Amino acid sequence: MAMNENAYPTTFPSFERENHRDALRQPFDPAFRRTWSNGVALRQLVDFARPTVANHTMSYALIEYCLSRLPMQHLERLGQLKIPVELHAAPFQYLQKHHRACGFDWVERFVWRTHDLHKPYNFLRPELLLAQESGSQRIVALLTIMPGEDYIRHYASILEVAQHDGAISSHHGPIRCVLYPHLTQSMMAWTGLTELSLSVEPGDILILGFVAELLPRFASLVPTARVIGRQDAQYYGLVRLELRPGLVFSLIGAKYSYWGNLGGRVVRELAARRPRAICYIAKQGTLLSPGDIHRTIYSPTRYCVFDKGQACWHGDDHSALPINPLSSRFPTFDRGLHVSTPTIVEQDVDFRTQVEAHGASSVDNELAQMARALTDVHEENPSMERVQLLPLMFITDYLRRPEELGMTVPFDLTSRNETVHRNKELFLARSAHLVLEAFNVIERPKAIIVGTGYGVKTILPALQRRGVEVVGLCGGRDRAKTEAAGNKHGIPCIDVSLAEVQATHGANLLFVASPHDKHAALVQEALDLGGFDIVCEKPLALDMATMRHFANQSQGSSQLRLMNHPLRFYPPLIQLKAASKEPSNILAIDIQYLTRRLSKLTHWSAGFSKAAGGGMMLAMATHFLDLIEWLTSSSLTPASVQDMSTSNSIGPLPTEDAGATKTPDVESAFQMNGCCGLSTKYSVDCDGAADTELFSVTLRLDNEHELRFIQRKGSPVLLEQRLPGREWLPLKVHWEQRVREGSPWQISFQYFAEELVEAICMGTRSAFADKATGFSDYARQVGVFGSKVGIA
């Protein structure tokens, strides 16, 4: 008895169901089963040694991965009913329409729902069907997949692992695979890509991969962009986005997975339209370090296709290999040779050893196939302008070495883990920036860092994280230290003047993190040169007159003149402020900062000298005053300070002169309290020579509730709340992204730097300046306490 389609949950909306019924209307030869399909056993199709958990780079997760790709609940039930399973490389609509030519009296969908209709693309997945063989009452289950040689082998290998593990019944012997070669060969035509690609204009930049996620990001980053064309077909979608006259991004999404060499077929079809470039933003695995998972962008320039343990195509052998337009700007993104292989199941430790011997650093299933397809197109059409290939790859797993199989690796190939989602969002945001920069839609700044302490430890990695090219590094007396840092990070100009680096490398962003008494001269030099956005560490200068002069000189400038006050960009403190709801709700703010910074020092340094701008007041006080102003949306004045005291607990320290010592003439600790706004009281307790590391901010609200941020070194950030007469409890907040681990000063600077770079790239300096702390704000903040500590 035939099954009623309406009795089972459909996986498509009604309009989409009708489209699928009309698909693949090809005439059939009555001898179809003999001429247009062929059946083989799994082992024939897989044709590589079946891996085990003992020799696969996924180790214990191999079985879990394979079973997660199959409808195991239904396959187990089918096994109990002794219903055999076949793998068919054809979509359901094809088999249903032509079921008699395929040898079945009827074919219907089973209840397994595999289609995620919340996703606009890449949602079509293998389906489980039931069919009755012609001329008998024998029922068979058909696992149907989209055709494509590599995709077929991939699913065949998954089934083989599952059957060998006992998860799928072996009652009927090896699983039979039925192939439809004509569907594979004509796939670009019957899926509609050939027709859809006619809407692509020569010179377009094509975006593949995470297109639905990137479209709103492109539109947000380029507010003047406009959609000039949109198509939605059965298997694809196209949006043409004009960034500026003459520059169009064509974002093409596929509703199925163009796995392995299908990716090459897609790219070859699109290359016929003569686009300027094809950008592929997707995920891959790494052979380099598990620390790269979810964190590091890979953008290869060299490619190799591997199959059955052999390199069957190597891009190094071809002069027509596509160029990566980003490689010259960000050479560190090119980690080495990229390898593509038909199936993840093939990636056992022997495979890893073989590809590593070829110099491989990363692996996926289709990127090298795309590079191969473009290379073939270039070689077949030597007179055509070559199509560029820009891959931006998100690392989701690490291929372990034989000795590492016991290692726990935080991979998540399904990308359903919450942490993966958060890091994927960061990757997509950065990828959107990088694609726009690669085609000169936006331009990242080129930076000079002055200072090899905080400058190299904190500023440099934060800028590199955002893709900023650091073109100059200036240090102090220890030139060898500066050269070593510069060489390590590929910085071209070492201890070269600002004017020269600006002239030779186009430097336009300056970070001043030198010794305190050198800040003023550097800021003045940059202001006189012009053309620099400036971010200065505290202090801006050692006297109020110079600070006010810089503030006045910066008035009306379209460029940024900022102090490094990053706490207002720190997500935990942003959440603390949000939890207070309104600044007027805050009755009191208590800030405590304890650090071993000074007590760890065993020799005299400029930090202990008033003449050199040392002491905790100049180093830290404005951080806390700035935080108070931000929390209360108010400005402090000298009258805001009711009481202030300083102290020094550091004794004489040895100097460079043998036997000589010096006693600090600045404070190692300070306390201050007062009022701000209409009625908010504040207190600050800062000790630079404490025996612990602690930073806390406590808010007392007008409803008698208390909120607290607290961070101890080596411990996670705590956000807490306390009701009257109760214990401290965790504050429930919604994090848009995982808070990075590390010092609040380093991490808050990373967030500050990210927004800074985006503001410069997108021409939104004014809005960012309103959010940050400028020279004039800083001069006013120092004026709150300056006269009390001898800063005139």
Curated annotation (Swiss-Prot):
The keyword Oxidoreductase applies. Disruption phenotype: Impairs the production of cordycepin. The keyword Oxidoreductase applies. Cordycepin has antitumor, antibacterial, antifungal, antivirus, and immune regulation properties; thus, cordycepin has important value in commerce, medicine, and scientific research. Induction: Expression strongly increases by addition of L-alanine that activates cordycepin production, as well as during the development of fruiting bodies. Expression is positively regulated by the two key transcription factors Kruppel-like factor 4 (Klf4) and retinoid X receptor alpha (Rxra). GO terms for cellular component: lipid droplet. PANTHER family: D-GLUCOSIDE 3-DEHYDROGENASE, UDP-N-ACETYL-2-AMINO-2-DEOXY-D-GLUCURONATE OXIDASE. This is Oxidoreductase cns1. It comes from Cordyceps militaris (strain CM01). The gene is cns1.
